[in-house]
Amino acid sequence: MKENPAPAAVGAAWQVVSVETTARTQIKDITREIAALVKQSGVESGVVHLYVPHTTAGILINESDDPDVARDIGDALDRLVPRGAAYKHYEGNADSHIKASLVGVSAVAPIEGGKLGLGRWQGIFFCEFDGPRQRQVKVRISRD
């Protein structure tokens, strides 16, 4: 019986994409940066793992064709979790922690034919909730 080899990771470590935000709440499209890493990897079929190592930021995959969608997401989160409400955390950014918890800090996308296998209208967004700041997204590309 032939054994299937374990999936090989591309590179020994996570790669880092730097993200500079310019507003306290900002939903920033980083699809191009991630797509460039996928292309550089040479992986034809696999998975890209994305992780945000911050407690007041997150990552999501959603519509990227209309920039109003990203603005609507940020505005909706600001309405759902307003800044300055009576939170127990007293550093002034409790709302940012809650928003990051709702959005999440990780995402996974397929690699198909050497490219990101996102849906037609999908993009990858870094979600800043306590900016402006210099942030990171950790990226790991694995082949099937």
Show which residues each predicted segment covers.
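Active-site histidine-anchored catalytic micro-motif
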Residues: 1-144
